[in-house]
């Protein structure tokens, strides 16, 4: 049986396990179905259900947090893989 050409794992810039526990600042153009920036503390990367987006999008579960780190809601979000890249450290 040949692999399904429509199933492509997400092309994440880091291994999925390195995303768990991280806080991502996701701009609205990198998160489907959102119209404002999302602060997300990642609890799970859903590789299996993310294979239908050409490798460009991934489903992330996590806690939406405010600027103080307080959890507002538990969410599942479809995020562009570019939003999962490590951010460079802030310069002093």
What are these regions (language model features)?
Residues 1-4, 90-92:
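Short, intrinsically disordered, low-complexity terminal/loop segments
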Residues 14-15, 50:
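Beta-strand elements of modular eukaryotic interaction domains
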Residues 37, 57, 74-76:
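Short edge beta-strand segments in beta-sheet-rich domains
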Residues 46-53, 67-69:
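Short, conserved beta-turn/loop elements at beta-strand boundaries and strand-helix junctions
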Residues 61-92:
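Intrinsically disordered, low-complexity, charged/polar segments
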């Amino acid at each position: 049986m040949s692999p399904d050409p429509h199933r492509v794992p997400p092309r994440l810039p880091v291994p999925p396990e390195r995303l768990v526990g991280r806080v991502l600042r996701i701009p609205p153009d990198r998160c489907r179905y959102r119209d404002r920036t999302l602060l997300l503390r990642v609890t799970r990367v859903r590789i299996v259900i993310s294979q239908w987006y050409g490798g460009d999008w991934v489903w992330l579960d996590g806690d939406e947090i405010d600027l103080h780190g307080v959890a507002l809601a538990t969410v599942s979000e479809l995020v562009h893989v570019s939003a999962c890249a490590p951010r460079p450290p802030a310069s002093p």
